[in-house]
Each structure stands twice: as structure tokens, then as C-alpha cells.
Amino acid sequence: MKLVTKSILLLLALGLIFPFLSFSQTATNDKYVVMLSLDAFRWDYSTQTNTPNLDKIAKEGVKAKALIPCYPSKTFPNHYSMATGLHPDHHGIVMNSFYDSTLGYYSMKDRAAVGNGAFYGGEPIWVTAEKQGIISASYFWVGSEAPVKGIHPTYWKPYEQRSSLLSRLDTVIHWLSLPLEQRPRLITWYF
């Protein structure tokens, strides 16, 4: 069973990384991955109100039909699971707040703990991208504030609750408007 799970995760990871593997880094049709998470936004909310921009993103890209959360179904464990492909008991972020007998207390409200790479096991997708020479960016994604395996995304923002929705959007648009040699091909964005 573990082999089947690992095989499925490997195929999923390859499917996410494959668009980055291009023979021409300067081609104008290079693909981009923007993984957007709207916390507490049910999968069907976009059908209950007018959401033309989200509809366009879904039409031109991909949208999950549904997700089955990891246990526990909390923000930090699940977002880091999406980034690594691992369950919380394998990547270490088992709750939004927890005690680790070696590292001490972890809390999403403790900026020092959130920025301590020792808490984060596994390899998030931005670390894999950076190791392959692919520029990545992360806006508030769990784990991106810490140097996981000594690596941050090229561009990243520490969590700031007061950051306006417009400034968040402007930052991501700015990243996508950078010159090709500076532009991230992978963006993880927690909204």
C-alpha cells in the first residue's frame, strides 16, 4: 500500500513539475503554475455568486473539483501537505499549534517558530523548483517563511494580517510582470 501511495504521489509531483521542464528557457510560451488557496472558500461558492475572474482562471487553467483534507483538517497541516505531497505525520506540521519534544512549541502565531526550517520536513514544491533552477515565489504559503533544507522561494512574503487584498494581488501581478529571466514560473499564494 505504501508503494502505491508513493507511486501516486510521484506521478502527481511529476505532473506538477513537468510544465517547468522546457528545452527553451526563453520561449514566450513557457508555462506558469499559480497555486491559489482561498482559505475557507468552499468549492461551490463560485457558482453561488458572480466570480468572473475566478471563472476565467478555472476555464484557462485547472480547478479542483473537490479536496479531501488531511487529518487534522487545519490550515497549516493541509497547506504544507499540498506543498509537499506528504501527510502531516510525515512532514511534521501536525496542527496549527503543537509541541515537539526536540524543537519546542510551534504556533502559527509565533513568527520565530514559523520561520524555523527545522519544523518543516519533506520538500515543498518551491524547494524542488529552486533546486532545478526554476524561479519560485510564495505569498503567505505555509512553510515559505522558513528556509526548508536551507532554501526559500526566490520571492516570498512573511505573513502580515494587515496586508490588503489589493496589495497582495498587486505583488503577484508584479512577479508575473518581471522580465523573463527574473519571473517566477511557480507561485504559491494563500489568500
Locate each region found by the language model.
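Bacterial N-terminal signal peptides that target proteins for export
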Residues: M1-L10
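Bacterial N-terminal signal peptides
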Residues: L9-P19
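Bacterial Sec-dependent signal peptides at the C-terminal "C-region" and cleavage site
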Residues: F18-N29
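A short beta-strand-to-alpha-helix junction
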Residues: N29, Y71-P72, N116-Y120
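Extracytoplasmic/secreted envelope proteins and their assembly/folding machinery
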Residues: D30, T51-D55, F76-Y80, G122-W126, ...
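Beta-strand elements within well-structured catalytic alpha/beta cores of enzymes
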Residues: D30-R42, I57, M82, A129, ...
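Short, structured active-site-proximal loop/turn typified by the sulfatase FGly-forming signature C/S-X-P-X-R
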Residues: S46-H91
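His/Asp/Glu-rich, glycine-adjacent segments
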Residues: H87-F191
